[in-house]
């Protein structure tokens, strides 16, 4: 964890099967706050990073020392670290483990549930969704991301039995949990190593379904293309059929391709796809020049990733080419004349 040696040598607690620093020691908090400052200077806004979970405190960096609850940093010390994150990161979202109006709820933070489907939905205060609601943080998802990790003991049962919807051992209804929390991302290491699953191909299909239920699901619900004085007037509407918005600025591009599929022009619009809430829509329009050569052309839409090698946003419409270009119109320049 990068804790200085002198903090190990002068710690309060003895060795067991692991080394645990004294989280109440202000010297440790000083070190962690200094780390966060430099961490933000180097990585805030780095397009390779989607979100950062705050970590640093408690077992596995999950902000608890269960079952030794008296060993956790005080609320004041926790607030110092959250304040350091809030100061150091303006662009990259930071996520906290627990929703709490006395600490994490005071800052521009998202949240992550690392016992997803196990302690996500319930009436008592131990459940993640209940904590969001009781601390009046259940609308945070509209501006800041929610995510987590499927409870480790639930991962193989879900993949084996394909009971993500009905609930498996240790698991609540996964899709209900996603819908209620508006989760955008989820960790599930078993979906990658597949160790212990009965049917790997079925497990992969199940994992794909779990993944596709998260976050935004953008579809082009309306489109209109008109020719006027050598220009193409293009308008379209994007609807979010998912459970959460997009949290980064991504911009749609209008692509004109010839009959052989070669791209002859690509125009990125200045209007972002960010922030379209579930079941809401946003309209876009632009005007571009007709291609110079005669022939048949296709008008398509997609949203390129600003990161080199990154995957674009692909609209969920079926009429796509190359798996990413959503076709909205075709035209023949001879007929336009």
Model-derived features with residue positions:
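An active-site-proximal structural segment forming one wall of the substrate-binding cleft
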Residues: 1-2, 7-12, 16-53, 77-84, ...
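Residue-level marker of positions within ordered structural domains that often coincide
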Residues: 44, 57, 90, 241, ...
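Hydrophobic/aromatic-rich, well-ordered segments within soluble, folded domains that form packed cores
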Residues: 47-57, 61, 232-239
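Catalytic-core regions of glycoside hydrolase
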Residues: 51-192
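Catalytic cores of secreted or luminal carbohydrate-active enzymes
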Residues: 170-223
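Extracellular/luminal regions of secreted and cell-surface proteins that mediate adhesion/ECM remodeling
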Residues: 208-337
């Amino acid at each position: 964890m990068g804790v200085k040696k002198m903090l190990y040598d002068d710690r309060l607690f003895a060795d067991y099967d692991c080394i645990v620093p004294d989280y109440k020691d202000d010297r440790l908090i000083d070190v962690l706050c200094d780390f966060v400052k430099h961490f933000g200077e180097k990585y805030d806004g780095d397009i390779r990073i989607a979100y950062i979970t705050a970590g640093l405190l408690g077992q596995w960096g999950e902000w608890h020392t269960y079952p030794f609850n008296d060993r956790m940093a005080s609320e004041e010390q926790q607030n110092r670290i959250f304040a350091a994150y809030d100061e150091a990161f303006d662009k990259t979202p930071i996520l906290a483990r627990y929703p709490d109006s006395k600490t994490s709820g005071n800052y521009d933070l998202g949240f992550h549930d690392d016992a997803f489907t196990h302690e996500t939905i319930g009436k008592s205060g131990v459940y993640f969704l209940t904590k969001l609601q009781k601390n009046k943080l259940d609308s945070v998802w509209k501006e800041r991301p929610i995510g987590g990790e499927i409870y480790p003991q639930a991962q193989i049962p879900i993949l084996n039995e394909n009971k993500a919807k009905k609930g498996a051992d240790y698991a609540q209804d996964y899709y209900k949990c996603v819908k209620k929390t508006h989760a955008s991302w989820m960790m599930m290491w078993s979906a990658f190593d597949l160790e212990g699953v009965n049917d790997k191909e079925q497990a992969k299909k199940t994992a794909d379904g779990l993944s596709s239920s998260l976050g935004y699901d953008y579809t082009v619900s309306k489109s209109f293309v008109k020719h006027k004085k050598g220009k193409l007037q293009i308008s379209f509407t994007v609807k979010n059929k998912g459970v959460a918005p997009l949290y980064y600025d991504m911009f749609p591009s209008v692509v004109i391709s010839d009959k052989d599929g070669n791209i002859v022009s690509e125009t990125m619009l200045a209007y972002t796809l960010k922030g379209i809430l579930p079941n809401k829509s946003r309209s876009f329009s632009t005007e571009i020049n007709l291609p110079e050569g005669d022939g048949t052309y296709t008008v398509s839409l997609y949203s390129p990733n600003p990161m080199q090698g990154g995957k674009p946003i692909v609209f969920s419409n079926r009429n796509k080419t190359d798996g990413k270009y959503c076709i909205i119109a075709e035209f023949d320049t001879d007929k336009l004349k």
